[in-house]
């Protein structure tokens, strides 16, 4: 797998040709295959992240905290620990000095806006969805974000969406309805509230994706992911938790057993962001997003293993239909000028 995450790049020889690639025509295919592999891996990490967070929310101090406070405190702790993992990775790969420089740029500010939308807003809705509807159901609905991204791109970026793309959007929404229409067995009295809050995450991540793709024209993906996570935790700690009285819960969590559970979830979350941004960089967002959305399928697997979930045929069918719709959305998207510019940046003409 090409090590874009580790920061290695083909070394050009005296003629300017990428000497690390002996067959020039193989470079794009090799990079794209690596990007698709990273996208699959990122989905697995994110599925594990959501299920492990669901376990943590059922532990002290979150289980005893107010319904509004617990998911927000868990989100702040998760993003803070994930930021620590990602900063350590940047330091290990020699990128630490790029963080403040990127943050001070215009594209860095765009990333901050994406972080607020995808972090405190979307992530909080996602965690409330897990708390009230269960991890597998919340993840199934939030997996429709590629379709949301397609709609937003059409409206705000004026990107064309083909008939196949619109069909995919309809199929994706239908899959989410199939997966979430009937409450699961068990004590989940606020199931539909959880579904509505998971929908907030879906919209928020769609908006975040559009903003982040624009910002990554000038900011390296690994650095962009780290700035996104760091901005999110700052907003949680400075703004959100003080407003809801959640700082004592966060402080209590730092000395509890649940800290280690969230630490594991944060490691998976950090790995997911690193691999997902690498996938976008190598394969392009239109190819990486649907494979990443397989996290809903991974969530079922991890829920069965870690929580003893017995998935219903309806849930499994809904997830599969959702993923099929996501594939239709991105396979029906025409190549835009941004896609071609991204290819030029990743695969210079001299290396082709």
Write out the residue ranges for each language-model feature.
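Hydrophobic/aromatic and small-residue hotspots that mark the transmembrane alpha-helices
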Residues: 53, 149-153, 208, 212, ...
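Structural signature of hydrophobic alpha-helical transmembrane segments
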Residues: 72-84, 128-145, 191-204, 254-269, ...
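Membrane-interface interhelical linkers
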Residues: 1-47, 58-72, 77-114, 127, ...
């Amino acid at each position: 797998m090409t090590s874009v995450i580790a920061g290695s790049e083909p070394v050009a020889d005296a003629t300017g040709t990428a000497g690390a690639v002996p067959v020039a025509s193989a470079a794009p295919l090799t990079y794209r295959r690596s990007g698709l592999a990273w996208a699959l891996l990122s989905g697995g990490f994110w599925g594990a992240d959501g299920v492990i967070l669901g376990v943590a929310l059922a532990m002290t101090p979150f289980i005893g905290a107010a319904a509004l406070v617990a998911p927000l405190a868990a989100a702040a702790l998760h993003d803070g620990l994930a930021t620590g993992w990602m900063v350590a990775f940047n330091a290990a790969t020699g990128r630490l000095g790029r963080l403040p420089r990127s943050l001070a740029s215009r594209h860095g500010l765009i990333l901050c806006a994406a972080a607020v939308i995808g972090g405190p807003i979307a992530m909080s809705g996602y965690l409330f969805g897990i708390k009230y509807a269960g991890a597998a159901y919340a993840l199934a609905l939030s997996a429709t974000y590629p379709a949301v991204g397609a709609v937003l791109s059409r409206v705000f970026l004026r990107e064309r969406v083909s008939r196949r793309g619109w069909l995919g959007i309809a199929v994706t929404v239908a899959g989410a309805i199939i997966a979430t229409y009937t409450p699961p067995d068990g004590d989940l009295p606020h199931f539909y509230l959880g579904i509505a809050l998971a929908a907030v995450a879906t919209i928020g991540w769609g908006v975040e994706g559009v903003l982040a793709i624009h910002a990554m024209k000038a900011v390296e993906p690994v650095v962009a992911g780290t700035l996104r996570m760091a901005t999110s935790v700052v907003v949680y700690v400075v703004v959100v938790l003080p407003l809801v009285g959640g700082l004592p819960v966060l402080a209590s969590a730092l000395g509890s057993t649940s800290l280690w559970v969230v630490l594991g979830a944060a490691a998976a979350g950090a790995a997911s962001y690193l691999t997902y941004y690498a996938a976008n960089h190598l394969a392009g967002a239109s190819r990486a997003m649907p494979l990443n959305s397989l996290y809903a399928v991974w969530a079922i697997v991890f829920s069965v293993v870690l929580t003893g979930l017995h998935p219903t045929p309806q849930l499994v069918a809904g997830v599969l239909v959702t993923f099929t719709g996501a594939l239709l959305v991105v396979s029906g998207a025409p190549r835009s000028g941004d896609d071609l510019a991204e290819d030029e940046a990743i695969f210079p003409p001299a290396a082709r």
